[in-house]
Amino acid sequence: METVVGLTAIAVALLIGLGALGTAIGFGLLGGKFLEGAARQPEMVPMLQVKMFIVAGLLDAVTMIGVGIALFFTFANPFVGQIAG
């Protein structure tokens, strides 16, 4: 049982860590492309900004879903019940 709990802790750490890393890379690329587009066509900034914030919200949503799944595995681990039962 300790092995399952330990491996679950490692999986949770990877889930949160890699999710945060992916979001950080995504935000970096998104911000860079937004600034590039704004410098190229300044009249398009309001439309680009709206689209940037929509995509930023979707990037955050993916990370928050990962955090929710990680919290589920941390506090209501379904794998421990399968071994004990």
From Swiss-Prot:
The keyword Kinase does not apply. F(1)F(0) ATP synthase produces ATP from ADP in the presence of a proton or sodium gradient. F-type ATPases consist of two structural domains, F(1) containing the extramembraneous catalytic core and F(0) containing the membrane proton channel, linked together by a central stalk and a peripheral stalk. During catalysis, ATP synthesis in the catalytic domain of F(1) is coupled via a rotary mechanism of the central stalk subunits to proton translocation. It is a multi-pass membrane protein. PROSITE patterns: ATPASE_C. This is ATP synthase subunit c. Signal peptide: none annotated. It is found in: Cell inner membrane. Belongs to the ATPase C chain family. It holds the Pfam family ATP-synt_C. F-type ATPases have 2 components, F(1) - the catalytic core - and F(0) - the membrane proton channel. F(1) has five subunits: alpha(3), beta(3), gamma(1), delta(1), epsilon(1). F(0) has three main subunits: a(1), b(2) and c(10-14). The alpha and beta chains form an alternating ring which encloses part of the gamma chain. F(1) is attached to F(0) by a central stalk formed by the gamma and epsilon chains, while a peripheral stalk is formed by the delta and b chains. GO terms for molecular function: lipid binding; proton-transporting ATP synthase activity, rotational mechanism. Its main location: membrane.
